[in-house]
């Protein structure tokens, strides 16, 4: 009975916007679907040869897919699949922690600039509190969560202060290497989404999702690795490999 209720509620929520800034069905050109033999993750194209995602992603037999809106549809057009050469975890990442939760993927070939594949800009400064950001990832249909996600969605939410974030997540150490994006308090609606969603503010990548108690597509507060604070590692890794 509970499962049937969640299925009906999920269908209704997918029909109507979760908030006035909800968008569905369009793939941001920097967004990458990371398909594997485990759970998928969301990635971001930051260079024609490089994708960034969260280090907590487990990606055996990885496929890097660009331009996809519905991973459950094998007939979707304008999809580009790329092999990868090597994966680089941040050297300080620990599975038991949400700190330093970043991973770089070097592709085997350069991705050509197109309408559905374009590298996002990296930040030159820290993102400000109250900045408006777009958070994008794929959602599952709660009527059958055993299938691939079938709905690409974007929600527009704001960066919150460290104080607000620490109040929302008292059990976590919210460091200067993190940003938090979302609405306090969260909505806690039933949901299942692909992890490692990016926070892109004014066309610039500022965060990669490490953790959320709920779903970021429901505007729940997410804790993100702050891309600005990891630029030295990102740039050194790309330069030396």
UniProtKB/Swiss-Prot annotation:
Q: What residues make up the catalytic site?
A: 56, 101
Identify the EC number(s). 3.4.21.4
Where is the signal peptide, in residue numbers?
1-17
Listed PANTHER family = KALLIKREIN-RELATED, SERINE PROTEASE 58
PROSITE patterns recorded = TRYPSIN_DOM (PS50240), TRYPSIN_HIS (PS00134)
Question: Which source organism?
Answer: Mus musculus (Mouse)
Q: Which GO terms describe its biological process?
A: proteolysis
* Coiled-coil segments: none
**A single Gene Ontology CC term:** extracellular region
Q: Report the protein name in the record.
A: Putative inactive serine protease 58
Residues the record marks as carrying a glycan: 156
